[in-house]
Every structure is written in structure tokens, then in C-alpha cells.
Amino acid sequence: MKYKNLREFLDLLEQKGELKRITQEIDPYLEMTEIADRTLSKGGPALLFENPKGYKIPVLCNLFGTPERVAMGMGQEDTKALRELGKLLAFLKEPEPPKGFKDLIGQLPQWKQVLNMPSKVLNKADCQQVVISDDDVDLYQLPIMHCWQGDVAPLVTWGLTITQGPYKKRLNLGIYRQQLIGKNKLIMRWLSHRGGALDFQEWKEANSDKPFPVSVALGADPATILAAVTPIPDTLSEYAFAGLLRGHKTEVVKSISNDLEVPASAEIVLEGYIDLNETALEGPYGDHTGYYNEQEYFPVFTVTHITMRKDAIYHSTYTGRPPDEPAVLGEALNEVFIPILQKQFPEIVDFYLPPEGCSYRLAVVTIKKQYAGHAKRVMMGVWSFLRQFMYTKFVIVCDDDVNARDWKDVIWAITTRCDPARDATLIENTPIDYLDFASPIAGLGSKMGIDATNKWAGETQREWGTPITKNPDVVKRVDEIWESLGIED
């Protein structure tokens, strides 16, 4: 099913028992996080806090708190169907010309989906039913969650930050946390390689005296939200990809104070600018690592306008030690990554980002090994092919007889097929997440690849072990008599 706006998605979730309305008064200061965290850890429903303490606007949490809800938000029946979405992205990333008429006919469904890519610009939109401007702007009227007791201030978490570089036609949508520091001020924490930061840097070089326009949408439709966290090709806008997910064009409307187009169905939109010379010290905040991060200076976003629906919903989340919502998103989007990687490396059988690895810091890859040194090639490919994995610290490569998603299997492969000196590849001075305080220098650290494959000639001088296997006839015989033996499973 496809959803035109967030409300349609919430209606369906409620029908399926996947949304719980909380009518009791709950404080956005710490209490919502505690309730959301307990609920998510048990695979529970999305939560709509209808009576946040001190505020009139309800708060939505845990929207994508299970992989199944992520798949639903992308218009898919289950997480397995996300593989097909990954195949479409692989096609868009590197489209292949048809080899003949039959192949052309086979590609028609993919090209038909591309027709849904351009956005549809509206003159009037629900997200602008209420307009607050200038001195009336007061971010303290929004129920912005204060997630952890060590956090320095309330934090905007699920805002879709919309930017555009001076030389680009496409808009960029990114999700960057934003610290509340004043009634019209937020700190925009974006890392230097992210799309918004790149747009900002290009703007500074081209317009040394003009503020950088920014709009932030909260509570967009699920396809648009998820497009912002999906590994789409750099040449494709998130709005275009959302149109593919939804099956019809993304409806947008021009911001009131700038030329940026925002999701027409968004619940709340913050409009404003970043002064090129204004920064502030951000943090500390509890993050997806399970720790509080270091403080660092980032640009300040000045909000000049707030537009919203008359009965707006504030969409929020928390981040902490997995499981949290980012970890769940990573688990679901894992299925999207696989076909993209397989198009470049057909030997890859499976690719898994364990949620315990903080979404992306450790990857397990299984391959159909074809030659000596093959595992090392795959390691390098994982680190370099998609920008999403430039911060992956550990890549473990196993043969295809190992289940990448079973730690018992992976550990068995490491301990029986790996020699630390021969099979561990260390690379120093590589890009690392700024939040990774384990690295010796902020933003710069090392990576480790572990070759846990069976070794071929040229990789070892010893006779390699033969795995123990069971006799299939005996297995079948015991299966037939098992119940009669009276042994409990």
C-alpha cells in the first residue's frame, strides 16, 4: 500500500494494531524516551503521545521501530521485498542498455517507475495552513524531546533538512540532529561529507556575503522520510526516489521565505537561514553508540518562519545503544544494500550489518570465493563502493557455507579459518565517524578486515581441513523415527 501523507500511514498502523495512542500526560523530558525505549526493545507499536506535558502538539515516536514498519513505509509487504527495491536502485545507479527487443520489454516496468520521479509543485498545501513568522517564532512551543539526562538541551531528531547548492538543480534531503539553543535558533550538526554540508560549503565559496537558505520538514509522508535515509544514487533526488516508492509524484510546495520546495503534506516546516559566520558549540548528546559524544562547533540555523497543519503532529525519536530506531532502520535497509553491492560484486551472497554494531560499524559478507586474495578485494569494495560504508570499521568476509546473520557460525569461521597475522588487514588514517571516540583523532582512524574464508593455494602452505558433514541417509532415517524416540526437542 502507498501513502500520500503521514496520516494515511498512521491510520493503517492503527488498524493493524501497530499504533498505540497514549492519552496520559507524558513529559517530553526523559519520560517519552523511557517509554519509547522499552516499547521498541520488545518490538512494540509506534507511539502517539496525545498529551505531552506542557504542550498542545502531540508527539509521534517509534514510527519505524520494527523492520516490518520500515518495509510498510516503503510500500512493501515485508522486508524481503526490499531486495526488489535494491535491484531498482542498482539499475538506476548503473542502468544497462537493452541487449535486444526482448530485453527492452523486460526493462519497461523499471522505466515506467521512473516516470513517477519528477515532483509535482502545488500552489497551496496543508503544511502551510498555519504560518508563524518573525518575532512570533518560538521553538519552545514545540514538544521537542530531551532524550537523556546528560543531554545539554532538547534535540530535533527527525527533521528532513532541505538544501540546494548554488550549482545544482536537485534538492538534497538529509537528516541531521539539531540542538535547541534559542526561541529561533538551532545548531545544525552535519558531517562534512553529508549532502547538506556539501551544499553549504559550495554556497560559502560562491556567496561569501549571503545567508544560506534552509528549510526543515517534520512529519512528512513515510516514503519521503525513508528516501532521506536510503542509499540512492547521487544524481537522484530524495523527492524523486520517494515518488518511485509511492507510485506517484511527490507533492511539494515552495517555502514561504525561500525558494526551497518542501513536502506539501508535512506536519511542521521550519524555514530560515544559516549565517555563514555563525557557529555554536554542539552537544554533548547521547547517541546511537550508547555513549555521549564530544562537543564540537557547527553552523547555527536561524528560524524565521514556522508553518504547520492546524492539528499538527510532532515527529520525534531518540538514539541510544542498540536497539534503537536507527538500528532498526539499518537492519531493514540492509536488504536494500545487497542488490546494489551484488551488481558490482556478483560473488557476494549475503551482506549483514548486525544491529549491535551501531548500524554500520561492522559488516559480515559471505562470498563465492573464486581465487586467492578474493576476500581482500571484497573488503576494499565494501569500504569504497558506497559512501554509506566509509565509516564501517570492521569487515568480516566468510565463505558462502557460513550464515552471515548467525554469530555462532561467523565466530566458528573466524576461529577455524583465520590466522590473525595473515588474515587481518589493517588500514590506518581512514575516515571515521566523528562520534567514534575510540579513534585516536576525531574523524580519522583505522579499519580492520578479517578474512575468515577457506584458504586456497598461495594463501597457505598447509593442507586445509575438510569440514565434518553428516550422512544424509542417516539424517533422513533419524528424522523418520525421531518422535517415537521420545526425546524432547
Swiss-Prot record:
Keywords assigned: Cell membrane, Decarboxylase, Flavoprotein, FMN, Lyase, Manganese, Membrane, Metal-binding, Ubiquinone biosynthesis
Pathway annotation: Cofactor biosynthesis; ubiquinone biosynthesis
InterPro entries membership: UbiD (IPR002830), UbiD-like_C (IPR049381), UbiD-like_N (IPR049383), UbiD_bacteria (IPR023677), UbiD_Rift_dom (IPR048304)
Amino acids binding Mn(2+): N172, E238
Disulfide bond residue pairs: none
Positions of prenylated FMN binding: I175, Y176, R177, R189, W190, L191, R194, G195
Location in the cell: Cell membrane
Protein name: 3-octaprenyl-4-hydroxybenzoate carboxy-lyase
